[in-house]
Amino acid sequence: MKFRLEPLLNLRKHHEDDCKYKLKKEEVVLLSIQRELAAVDQRTAQEAEYLEKVGTGRIDPFLLSSGSSFLSYLWQKRVEIDEARVSQEKQVAAAREDLISARKERKTMEKLKENFMKQQNKAALNREQKTLDEIGISLVHLGKR
């Protein structure tokens, strides 16, 4: 006998695959945000070091103002990227939860299928044993005649 929930099991498998894909996609986006954040941090450190070098000795007001405005831009950019990173981490966590849920559903369906197959095998063995018992009883009765 065929497992009647097989189409549902297949849907669960496809749903799990979709969840895996979405999780990987979100993780790639998070990784790119983290790389961008690292690049901004590196650029900020370079700019601060440069301003410190240039600021020693004579001070050029134009250079100082443009450097500090660029630094404030970099700091603002870092805040924006950090907010995007936090948001993306939440999306990754949600995708991970969806994947865990999909795996549980698939494993439940597979367990149901496994139990169904065990019952079917047991029933088939019982039918076969019953048939063999009937054949044996028939042979015994034939031998008594």
Please give the residue ranges for each predicted region.
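Charge-rich amphipathic alpha-helical interaction elements
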Residues: 1-145
